[in-house]
């Protein structure tokens, strides 16, 4: 019954609020189509004009796009720029007393940072990194920090002196942190003693200590610690230094480093299907331009707006839409420490009311959880300040979309259901709030200048209603530049599978359907990546972790639909020596495997279901048929070709076990 209602609701068209559309930057579909036409007519001129108008340059670029070494594209060649200057200094003339950041801690503390204050703190932090830690242009700095204002200072300080930051999500394990430190060959690691979560101290420094123990990260010279929750922690003499004790001795004047357009801005590690995380490398100018443009187009950001993106800075959404995008626009961005549920499920709605939030951007997982746990909470608060709502990280189901639209947006706010990736830097497909007629759960249309198409494996376009591979067929400024230290993997991952007009195109790894109006609906991953609560987790790294359990001979992990998280993890496990386990033992084994996952990856990786099987379905070449296992996990009919299987009986045995467990 609910499915039928969802399907019917998903067909409805919602036009932009007329009053909002009148004052929007892009007011209707004609204006959208004009921009698309302009970009198509002269692609390089379109992007070059935007870069000249929107960014402040120390030296103008002399070439918009260099494709000579494709797919290693270069944008705005030979231009000189600094990202921190564009996010802070250029606003000081007219906006020095404007609020740049509003911070609210979980324990009720808050802080308001003006652009003048931000300038001072970033400069002092930059001088600290230079003078006391010898951080120079091109050095890598790992930031393992919670959602506090000092995290933003660290990011911008790195950009000011030309260091490359790599933020590691504060929920990741010491092992995951160690892997990223070593891959980046980081010189300095910055962390906090801890933070607050669900009303209690949550410690980070012990994880760093474990990551660095026994000289496991030889590139690291020192660690810088921000005191946040003031709990007692251990210090390593000569290695660990306290930020709070040192920063105020530094000058608040620091000239920004002149950076080339293509100089790396940051590395951000994302899950790869091979198990080893990929260090996605983004450039300075191209990334920042698109961060600013998508803020202006997709959120229609205005001078007096309070913008709140709930993402953690450890993810690309936090980079682009908590920090760089809002600050490049001279807007006010909100930062929240802790969870949505503490002290209760009304916390986010109280924040919107108290800080008069205009544009609100969050994940479908959060929406589903708030709907399930606190459906009536929004009615207790005044949410009339909201003008645009946004979703990110995964497809949103119609039921959650409907609740978000009606109960949070009061049926008057456009929902911008954005599709993009760590690798794209910013939005690729999204409605425009003043122009695009929207449908529930539909990403709608590519943004101007973006050539996103749904293709078959042979490079032909799919017919309306047919599922295909979502590709981007022309380079764009904010695209990934490389995988750190692994050019071959960069090409193999993104530019080696589908050709259009004889040239390889960017393969997103997502499946999609385009309708007769050109609207694109995202289906989900087509590779071995599972999207859990908006976090991309590689099944290979999950399998590698749980295989470390002494009772596990081999395993295969697939993603299955989850009402709250979007996708959950389902493991098919073969026990050593054909061992079997009863219900109690199987539950204990599940608990132990999840403990291993929390250590190896972090608490975001957790098995929801396990099926103990005698073997795994493999082709004669030894490849596990995960699509077949996914069908079994989802209780769908088996439609895959079984002729290449080494042993068809394995499938029959697994299906028999599945039927018994129903």
From Swiss-Prot:
E.C. code: 6.2.1.1
UniProt binding sites for Mg(2+): 549, 552
Recorded GO CC terms: cytosol
Alphabetical UniProt keywords: Acetylation, ATP-binding, Ligase, Magnesium, Metal-binding, Nucleotide-binding
Residues noted as binding ATP in the record, renumbered to the chain: 393-395, 417-422, 510, 525, 536
Gene Ontology biological process: acetyl-CoA biosynthetic process; acetyl-CoA biosynthetic process from acetate
GO molecular function: acetate-CoA ligase activity; AMP binding; ATP binding; metal ion binding
Binding residues for CoA: 197-200, 317, 533
Modification after translation (UniProt): Acetylated. Deacetylation by the SIR2-homolog deacetylase activates the enzyme.
Known cofactor(s): Mg(2+)
N6-acetyllysine: residues bearing it: 623
Catalytic EC class: ligase
Highest taxon, organism lineage: Bacteria
Family matches, as InterPro entries: Ac_CoA_lig, ACAS_N, AMP-bd_C, AMP-bd_C_sf, AMP-binding_CS, AMP-dep_synth/lig_dom, ANL_N_sf
Reactions performed catalytically: acetate + ATP + CoA = acetyl-CoA + AMP + diphosphate
Misc remark: There is no ortholog for acsA in strain J99.
UniProt family annotation: Belongs to the ATP-dependent AMP-binding enzyme family.
Job description of the protein: Catalyzes the conversion of acetate into acetyl-CoA (AcCoA), an essential intermediate at the junction of anabolic and catabolic pathways. AcsA undergoes a two-step reaction. In the first half reaction, AcsA combines acetate with ATP to form acetyl-adenylate (AcAMP) intermediate. In the second half reaction, it can then transfer the acetyl group from AcAMP to the sulfhydryl group of CoA, forming the product AcCoA.
Annotated HAMAP family: Ac_CoA_synth
Protein name: Acetyl-coenzyme A synthetase
The gene coding this protein: acsA
